[in-house]
Amino acid sequence: MFEKITEQPSLYDRLEEKSTREILEDINREDRKVAEAVSRTIPMIERLVEQIIPRMEQGGRLFYMGAGTSGRLGVLDASEIPPTFGMPPTFVIGLIAGGDRALRNPVEKAEDNTERGWEELLSHGVNSSDTVIGIAASGTTPYVIGALREARRHGILTGCICSNIESPLAAEADCPIEVIVGPEYVTGSSRMKSGTAQKMILNMISTSIMIRLGRVKGNRMVNMQLSNNKLIDRGTRMLMSEFDLSYEDARTLLLRYGSVRIASESMKQKPPKK
């Protein structure tokens, strides 16, 4: 039975009468519940990830879809895949109701359009090798529900992340993830605990997939894009550690090849010094 936990009254009241310290401690107390709630969903996350990996190994893509905070978190996670793991920006794609304008400002009624989500997926050439994950704390967002319903009808793997039990969105997902974090500190403000849970789960999904696809070596981002001085320094220190090089030699090697992984492979192919 569908239960709208995200709209239940807060466990706290008369918030406007509290001190700053009391508010902060209350929020932190509630946030500590999120990690435990996420831990209970690990079997659900595993089931979804294990089905995504073989699809992506064969060239399939991953789509995140959401509105408001949920959509922004999907776009955020997708945007981190190229710099962190060196994958093309078309590998994981985040779609938000209302388009890029909605990343900064609310777009009136964009999330209420049931057809628009599927139309956007079609514009990206979505097909049965891809996966679509809908993100909606309430599990009732029409933009996301409509997209998942059509995706599933076309034989596309579907998953979802929501914070209510047996929601309409979960009914459209092959692999639903229901992370129940309880009432929000500010009643109905699902950008809080529900949003935190979504971010944690998205991190787990994308990171576990990238590791399983060989984009991490040991515990290091050997395929990261060298897009700023901080990352060049990080890559340099990786090579220093692996091959006992000076900072200058490691940096020169890294910049020559433009990739930690390729630089490392080049060193391993060199004949040993006599």
From Swiss-Prot:
The family database entries (PROSITE patterns) matched by this protein are listed as: GCKR, SIS
Instruction: For this UniProt record, give its keywords in alphabetical order, as a comma-separated list.
Output: Carbohydrate metabolism, Lyase
Asked whether the UniProt record includes Lyase among its keywords, one would answer: yes
The family this protein is said to belong to? Belongs to the GCKR-like family. MurNAc-6-P etherase subfamily.
Q: Which HAMAP family match?
A: MurQ
The job of this chain, per UniProt, is described as: Specifically catalyzes the cleavage of the D-lactyl ether substituent of MurNAc 6-phosphate, producing GlcNAc 6-phosphate and D-lactate.
- Protein name per UniProt: N-acetylmuramic acid 6-phosphate etherase
